[in-house]
Curated annotation (Swiss-Prot):
Pfam family, one: Serpin
Keywords: Apoplast, Cytoplasm, Glycoprotein, Protease inhibitor, Secreted, Serine protease inhibitor, Thiol protease inhibitor
Domain notes from UniProt: The reactive center loop (RCL) extends out from the body of the protein and directs binding to the target protease. The protease cleaves the serpin at the reactive site within the RCL, establishing a covalent linkage between the carboxyl group of the serpin reactive site and the serine hydroxyl of the protease. The resulting inactive serpin-protease complex is highly stable.
Positions bearing carbohydrate: 375
Presence of the UniProt keyword Flavoprotein in the record: no
Tissues where the protein occurs: Expressed in root tips. Expressed in siliques (at protein level).
Subunit structure: Interacts with RD21A.
Compartment(s) where it occurs, according to its Swiss-Prot or TrEMBL record: Secreted, Extracellular space, Apoplast; Cytoplasm
Family the entry assigns: Belongs to the serpin family.
Name assigned to this protein: Serpin-ZX
InterPro entries noted in UniProt: Serpin_CS, Serpin_dom, Serpin_fam, Serpin_sf, Serpin_sf_1, Serpin_sf_2
Recorded GO CC terms: apoplast; cytoplasm; extracellular space
Length: 391
């Protein structure tokens, strides 16, 4: 299976995850998360698992072996998620970290995989007597790696004396629009909420041609980021239902249509009569383990087979399971571009149709979905929904 095919399958997993997050965690509020971040943490857990746990994660992520998964993840980390700011592209930073209790040690083969494939730093920690300090250490690490955007990926009390292992992943993205918006043209306007009420929000606009396509029941806008000297091309896509309350139906359509994202990319610039998109800034956090369990990924959290390929002690490995995968992301969209960050931490404890028009409108004055994608590979960095640009 080639990388592009693998990514297409990953995107199906990501959109399914997005639907589950939105419907179970936060149907009526803004959502932003990074499927790329969550997939990296799951990949690391799979690499340290055996038996049913390994098989279930591989099946969930649609891979046939851990070797295939590791080489795919390694390629994504090094090729797609590499920083491009030095050559004029988006600032991108991905970091992985592992904290293991001082009573345990990683298997040398697993530690090497962490360092080589996932560029992950491993740290010893004293969970027995200093769990609070370890939480603070992980959070300050996430803050540093996300340029200060995320200050708390692990909530208070998320680790205790029973905790043996924490994996964390942080992803930071800052891109400048290829065509910046003129700040003097930004005006207040009405945004329609899901409950029928309205709020007044600042809307950006432009008279320039835009990458917009109209489909049956929705429109898609692509805003490209300034590209660096490498081949990567990042864009933010806005999926805007025609109906003010059409977000849920659009999400269903995206999830139930294989290859939806790849097949609904606006390829040409068109004249736009009325063009308005809101400015917004928000953060969103959730426990991804609950969502993953709801999607059938249960073995890593039950400790049936343990994480025997991670640690030197086979007996201790059998009793290790994942207790939580905490995820936090934030995003800001303004005239200059986008700043976004996400961090995930997995805590492991000891068991106790297309219509072409010459000119169209694109007025995002009601709830919409957004996706940040690398266009050459199709890798999805962030998925979200904006239901209220003020919150």
């Amino acid at each position: 299976m080639d990388v592009r095919e693998s990514i297409s399958l990953q995107n199906q997993v990501s959109m399914n995850l997005a639907k589950h997050v939105i419907t179970t965690v936060s149907q009526n509020s803004n959502v932003i998360f990074s499927p790329a971040s969550i997939n990296v943490v799951l990949s690391i857990i799979a690499a340290g698992s055996a038996g049913a746990t390994k098989d279930q994660i591989l099946s969930f992520l649609k891979f046939s072996s851990t070797d295939q998964l590791n080489s795919f993840s390694s390629e994504i980390v090094s090729a797609v998620l590499a920083d491009g700011s030095a050559n004029g592209g988006p600032k991108l930073s991905v970091a992985n970290g592992a904290w293991i209790d001082k009573s345990l040690s990683f298997k040398p083969s697993f530690k090497q995989l962490l360092e080589d494939s996932y560029k992950a730093a491993s740290n010893q920690a004293d969970f027995q007597s200093k769990a609070v300090e370890v939480i603070a250490e992980v959070n300050s690490w996430a803050e540093k790696e996300t340029n200060g955007l995320i200050t708390e990926v692990l909530p208070e009390g998320s680790a205790d004396s029973m905790t043996k292992l924490i994996f964390a992943n942080a992803l930071y993205f800052k891109g400048t629009w290829n065509e910046k918006f003129d700040e003097s043209l930004t005006q207040e306007g009405e945004f329609h909420l899901l409950d029928g009420n309205k709020v007044t929000a600042p809307f950006m606009t432009s008279k320039k041609k835009q990458y917009v396509s109209a489909y049956d029941g929705f429109k898609v806008l692509g805003l490209p980021y300034l590209q660096g000297q490498d081949k990567r091309q990042f864009s933010m896509y806005f999926y805007l239902p025609d109906a003010n309350n059409g977000l849920s139906d659009l999400l269903d359509k995206i999830v139930s249509t294989p290859g939806f994202l790849d097949n609904h990319i606006p390829r040409r610039q068109v004249k736009v009569r009325e063009f308005k998109i809101p400015k917004f800034k928000f953060s969103f956090g959730f426990d991804a383990s609950n969502v993953l369990k709801g999607l059938g990924l249960t073995s890593p959290f039950s400790g049936e087979e343990g994480l025997t390929e991670m640690v030197e002690s086979p007996e201790m490995g059998k009793n290790l399971c994942v207790s939580n995968i905490f995820h936090k992301a934030c995003i800001e969209v303004n005239e200059e571009g986008t700043e976004a960050a996400a961090a995930s931490a997995g805590v492991i404890k000891l068991r106790g149709l297309l219509m072409e028009e010459d000119e169209i409108d694109f007025v995002a004055d009601h709830p919409f979905l957004l996706v940040v994608t690398e266009n050459i590979t199709g890798v999805v960095l962030f998925i979200g929904q904006v239901v209220d640009p003020l919150h």
